[in-house]
């Protein structure tokens, strides 16, 4: 592995607005979380033993639950949110409908002051020369191509053939024949919005705008990184169905494949299959997504929350920038 790897800093999990308190039973510096102005506690089994540590953490968790249930929601606009974007188990409906509908949402919200992040560096292959034109400045275009090449070189250094694994079997069954097709569908999630900056994995944006985050394409890894970067809600499009979620921030599943929406209805939050089969448009699909976001940010549970899909997966191997 040539020693060229790093582990992303996930201390930003502490700023996630959906998490009112923090309790950790792991090797972590608690002072990393104190700047986020939330109750925080840490426990170590060293010197206490497993059972004693579990008891201490459970009692503190009970205290934190009492504190959290006393908090009250404050009114805010969707344009004040930090939002993460992801697609998984993509098919032709992803590139033609659900991703473009999210692209309309991205255009609307970034133009009104929201912060939006997208990533999946290796799955931009074949669309990188198109995406690079969306960056606001020449220096960002240069930086993006450097970041992309570094990631691709890293993949090759591990003896992995990306073009031999993408698109995957599910993508192919859904009508995607090449990585270029998949990548072109992927970037539809940002619409015609301009990219304001580039982030490292789990790095929080410092100001509003649309950001590219250099990440793995693995669903659990990316959702975890976006949550650590402060995503209050995440928009996840799927064609064939993907059940991954996170305990840190709500994940809204969006689908335009009628068969998936019918057979996996309990896993889909926004059915916009009418864009493909008739009865609705990209604009009405975007409206449905934004209406769902408003409900979720007001307390409504997403499918992943109700079904307890609570994956947490820090990226384990990543190119050193």
Region roles according to the model:
Residues 14, 19, 61, 83-85, ...:
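Buried hydrophobic positions in well-ordered alpha/beta secondary-structure cores of metabolic enzymes
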Residues 53, 80, 85, 91-321:
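Anaerobic metallocofactor- and corrinoid-dependent redox/one-carbon enzyme cores
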Residues 1-30:
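Flexible C-terminal active-site loop/helix
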Residues 8-10, 37, 78, 249, ...:
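Short, solvent-exposed loop/turn segments at the edges of secondary structure
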Residues 6, 39-41, 115, 211:
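Conserved beta-strand segments of alpha/beta enzyme cores
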Residues 19, 26, 31-73:
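Active-site cavity-forming subdomains of large catalytic enzyme subunits
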Residues 72-82:
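Glycine-rich phosphate/diphosphate-binding loops that line cofactor/substrate pockets in enzymes
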């Amino acid at each position: 592995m040539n020693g060229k790897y790093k582990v992303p800093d996930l201390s930003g999990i502490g700023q996630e607005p959906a998490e009112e308190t923090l309790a950790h039973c792991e090797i972590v510096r608690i002072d990393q979380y104190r700047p986020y102005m939330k109750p925080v506690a840490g426990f170590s089994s060293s010197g206490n033993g497993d059972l004693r540590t579990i008891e201490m953490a459970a009692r503190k968790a009970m205290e934190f639950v009492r504190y959290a249930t006393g908090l009250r929601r404050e009114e805010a606009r969707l344009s004040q949110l930090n939002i993460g974007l992801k697609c998984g188990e993509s098919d032709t409906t992803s590139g033609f409908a659900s991703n473009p509908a999210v692209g309309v949402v991205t255009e609307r919200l970034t133009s009104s002051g929201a912060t939006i992040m997208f990533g999946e560096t290796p799955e931009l292959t074949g669309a990188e020369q198109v995406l690079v034109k969306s960056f606001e400045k020449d220096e960002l275009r240069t930086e993006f191509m450097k970041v992309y090449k570094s990631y691709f070189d890293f993949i090759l250094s591990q003896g992995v053939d990306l073009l031999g694994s993408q698109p995957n079997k599910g993508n192919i069954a859904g009508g995607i024949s090449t990585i270029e097709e998949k990548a072109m569908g992927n970037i539809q999630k940002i619409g015609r919005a301009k990219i304001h900056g580039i982030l490292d994995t789990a790095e929080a944006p410092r100001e509003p705008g649309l950001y590219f985050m250099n990440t793995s394409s693995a669903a659990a890894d990316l959702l975890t990184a976006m949550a650590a970067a402060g995503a209050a809600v995440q928009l996840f499009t799927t064609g064939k169905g993907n059940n991954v979620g996170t305990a840190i921030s709500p994940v809204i599943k969006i689908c335009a494949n009628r068969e998936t929406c019918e057979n996996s209805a309990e896993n889909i939050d926004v059915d916009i299959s009418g864009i493909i089969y008739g009865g609705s448009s990209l604009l009405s699909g975007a409206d449905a997504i934004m209406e769902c976001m408003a409900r979720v940010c007001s307390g409504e549970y997403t499918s992943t929350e109700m079904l307890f899909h609570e994956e947490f997966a820090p990226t384990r191997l990543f190119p050193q920038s």
